């Protein structure tokens, strides 16, 4: 099932640099779904440099153009909702109808952020000096590392990716090892929508090693994580070393 995917780096699906894979199991019947690609340190480095390059392109893309591409992602998710739902059903063990609901909700999030892209307003502030005004302009924070859980793999990846895209940021998404295909399918839709190479990247594999390498890099400027409180504490402590911005949703 995973042969068409792998690591998504610089706009392309590629196997891991050493060809490593791991088994993904269907929780409803404990059958092996297939072998998903397992990222190496080299893959992580390539993804980091890809995201850095993608940021330079995306942050200069006009808001209305970004909005149109994000809206196209929403439309494609709706067109492919049954494919997305099938991945969710197989990997998470949810009923197919719930998978469809998650797919539709994911599309709604992309549509919402497509419009929010146009509403990133600055401010004009009065100055203490005559004939002078202060302009406040918001700029993309930079490369975002998005760490997603297994229980709602598509909708939470959609929330993180679409928000980063709306703000003009590039993103490296790390799905849970249990549900890589659900997020891979979403990222492939992003590719199909014409998002420039390097703007969205995906790393599949061991969460601890990948997350640690991402956070230790000077390229990553923000981390978004949905996960356990235990993992959140680890992430927050590591991010503090570089004063990286962190957004957490913890259980």
Describe each PLM feature range:
Residues 31-121, 131:
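Glycine-rich loop-to-alpha-helix module at the N-terminal edge of alpha/beta enzyme cores
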Residues 25, 42, 46, 61, ...:
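An amphipathic alpha-helix/helix-turn recognition signal
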Residues 1-35, 68, 72, 122-147, ...:
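Terminal low-complexity tails and localization/encapsulation signals of metabolic enzymes
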Residues 8, 55-59, 77, 165, ...:
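Hydrophobic residues in alpha-helical segments
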Residues 122-251:
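Rossmann-like NAD(P) dinucleotide-binding subdomain of oxidoreductase/dehydrogenase enzymes
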Residues 7-9, 23-26, 35-46, 194-199, ...:
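Histidine- and aromatic-rich ligand-binding microenvironments
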